[in-house]
Amino acid sequence: MDISIFLMVFLLFCVSLFLIFFVSCVKLSFFFVEWDFLSFKISVYFNSIMFSLILLLVTISVLVFSTYYLSGELNFNYYYFMLLVFVGSMFSLIFSSGCFSMLVSWDLLGISSFFLVLFYNNWDSCSGAMNTVLTNRLGDFFLFVFFSSTIFSSYYFLSLSFFCWLSSLMLLLASFTKSAQFPFSGWLPKAMSAPTPISSLVHSSTLVTAGLVLIMNFSEMILNKDVIMIIMVVGVFTMFFSSMAALVEEDLKKVVALSTLSQMGFSMLTVGIGLSFVSFIHLLSHALFKSCLFMQVGYLIHCSLGQQDGRNYSNLGNVPYFIQLQLLVTLFCLCGLVFSSGAVSKDYILEFFFSNFFMVVFACMFFFSVFLTFGYSYRLWKGFFMSFSRPVFCFSSSVVMNFLSLLLVLFSIFFIWWMNFNMLCMPCLFLYVDFFVPLFFVVMIMVVGFLCVKLLLKEFVYKFLVDFFAKGWVYGLKNYKFFDLFLGGINSLGVTFFSFTGFWSNSYMKSLYFNSVVIVLVLFFFLVWGCILSLKYALCKRMILAL
């Protein structure tokens, strides 16, 4: 692969960082063509720069990941070219501010996704590609009607109220088809027949986010009670049905895809309640940890000889510990646990939602949809590491593939928090001090105490009464083979002494006990960190109130 492409992408990444720090408060526009019937210009402002920075980071990771995941494919040059077209069309959609450039970028995004899903050229990929392109072409039609009705009503001064309502409806339908909202959600699980690097890019920061980016660019046009109600209802239905489907789905990639669909519904609901900027921040954090999650699942599929059925995965204790830790951290971010990047936007959205008055059925569906996020995340983790059969598993010899998503994991944990401290104005910090910290302390103390008493006590009772007492003392007193037991103990001790390191490293994560110990240690770390941060912000709040 040509190294100049990586250098070009890295240069764009550095330029995006420069623009964030020095022109974050300025909106720049560059005009290339300006005629009466055709205008081509790009706009550079804070949202487009931030999204392009995250897209560049994810694209670099996907490019490197593709060189290892698809190293033996014959059509790799075709894949690489279509991937660059796909990413370039998303960049063009982000920075475009004219009808012509936006339509061209929108069409290129759907067409390139068709060729990428069609990469493996089998029955599943052909069916998924056709489903994807037909649904996206329907969205292209809605977007064309939206721009046409807007221009027509502005030129001929017809019934503006009717045309504004029609334009808003076409805008919603176009964004619903591209972001796979209800009832246009069928193409997203079928698009999982594409290679896993493409799934990582599509479900993090490109195709499914394009509809939300479009509706955020025209957020002033949806300030209508009926339009907002449609957005909220569609977002809640998408969350609920995708979360329920993720609980019963067995295909690993489809489970992660349905979790993406649930988060897109969550972001659409956030736009509906009037928090467009908060929804944008949630998209940024989701792009980071979801691309990392897809890479880790793709690594496990690649090492398991392409096996995607979750029922055939279990007891993957031989997976490198760093991959297991990354998978756990990304699932924490997906659930929006405290002091992760997902919590920066998710907790504020939940607080804002439950501080308003909605219908009981509507609020219950939203609550259960959020709660089911923990359900399918735990099911995914349990299916990997907490069962008792053994799959065929081949390790990757590449260190780069094992540690590729490290940068995405670090950004998933610290980047949004750093932005919230330095650049954003999201009042989510005081939520922890006023409400979440006491509740967090109580819940964490109860959970840690229950796990320690339940697991450690059961382990001690089993090891002492069942294993050690029955096999050692009772066997020796009954058969009086003290000398044989003594020699056998010496032999066993010697073998254990020489093979302890290898045996421990291979069997560390195979049992429920050790998994529970690791989870308890991670939760204890979060507890200590929460105590320190809560004390710090409590002091800051008292100083602010005193002033």
Curated annotation (Swiss-Prot):
<dbReference type="GO" id="GO:0008137">
    <property type="term" value="F:NADH dehydrogenase (ubiquinone) activity"/>
</dbReference>
<comment type="function">
    <text>Core subunit of the mitochondrial membrane respiratory chain NADH dehydrogenase (Complex I) that is believed to belong to the minimal assembly required for catalysis. Complex I functions in the transfer of electrons from NADH to the respiratory chain. The immediate electron acceptor for the enzyme is believed to be ubiquinone.</text>
</comment>
<feature type="transmembrane region" description="Helical">
    <location>
        <begin position="45"/>
        <end position="65"/>
    </location>
</feature>
<feature type="transmembrane region" description="Helical">
    <location>
        <begin position="3"/>
        <end position="23"/>
    </location>
</feature>
<dbReference type="InterPro" id="IPR001750">
    <property type="entry name" value="ND/Mrp_TM"/>
</dbReference>
<dbReference type="InterPro" id="IPR003945">
    <property type="entry name" value="NU5C-like"/>
</dbReference>
<protein>
    <recommendedName>
        <fullName>NADH-ubiquinone oxidoreductase chain 5</fullName>
        <ecNumber>7.1.1.2</ecNumber>
    </recommendedName>
</protein>
<keyword id="KW-0249">Electron transport</keyword>
<feature type="transmembrane region" description="Helical">
    <location>
        <begin position="80"/>
        <end position="100"/>
    </location>
</feature>
<keyword id="KW-0830">Ubiquinone</keyword>
<feature type="transmembrane region" description="Helical">
    <location>
        <begin position="460"/>
        <end position="477"/>
    </location>
</feature>
<feature type="transmembrane region" description="Helical">
    <location>
        <begin position="430"/>
        <end position="450"/>
    </location>
</feature>
<keyword id="KW-0679">Respiratory chain</keyword>
<feature type="transmembrane region" description="Helical">
    <location>
        <begin position="485"/>
        <end position="505"/>
    </location>
</feature>
<keyword id="KW-0496">Mitochondrion</keyword>
<feature type="transmembrane region" description="Helical">
    <location>
        <begin position="101"/>
        <end position="121"/>
    </location>
</feature>
<keyword id="KW-1278">Translocase</keyword>
<feature type="transmembrane region" description="Helical">
    <location>
        <begin position="227"/>
        <end position="247"/>
    </location>
</feature>
<dbReference type="Pfam" id="PF00361">
    <property type="entry name" value="Proton_antipo_M"/>
</dbReference>
<keyword id="KW-0999">Mitochondrion inner membrane</keyword>
<feature type="transmembrane region" description="Helical">
    <location>
        <begin position="512"/>
        <end position="532"/>
    </location>
</feature>
<keyword id="KW-1133">Transmembrane helix</keyword>
<feature type="transmembrane region" description="Helical">
    <location>
        <begin position="264"/>
        <end position="284"/>
    </location>
</feature>
<keyword id="KW-0812">Transmembrane</keyword>
<feature type="transmembrane region" description="Helical">
    <location>
        <begin position="198"/>
        <end position="218"/>
    </location>
</feature>
<dbReference type="GO" id="GO:0015990">
    <property type="term" value="P:electron transport coupled proton transport"/>
</dbReference>
<feature type="transmembrane region" description="Helical">
    <location>
        <begin position="399"/>
        <end position="419"/>
    </location>
</feature>
<feature type="transmembrane region" description="Helical">
    <location>
        <begin position="319"/>
        <end position="339"/>
    </location>
</feature>
<comment type="similarity">
    <text>Belongs to the complex I subunit 5 family.</text>
</comment>
<keyword id="KW-0520">NAD</keyword>
<feature type="transmembrane region" description="Helical">
    <location>
        <begin position="132"/>
        <end position="152"/>
    </location>
</feature>
<keyword id="KW-0813">Transport</keyword>
<feature type="transmembrane region" description="Helical">
    <location>
        <begin position="352"/>
        <end position="372"/>
    </location>
</feature>
<dbReference type="GO" id="GO:0042773">
    <property type="term" value="P:ATP synthesis coupled electron transport"/>
</dbReference>
<keyword id="KW-0472">Membrane</keyword>
<dbReference type="GO" id="GO:0005743">
    <property type="term" value="C:mitochondrial inner membrane"/>
</dbReference>
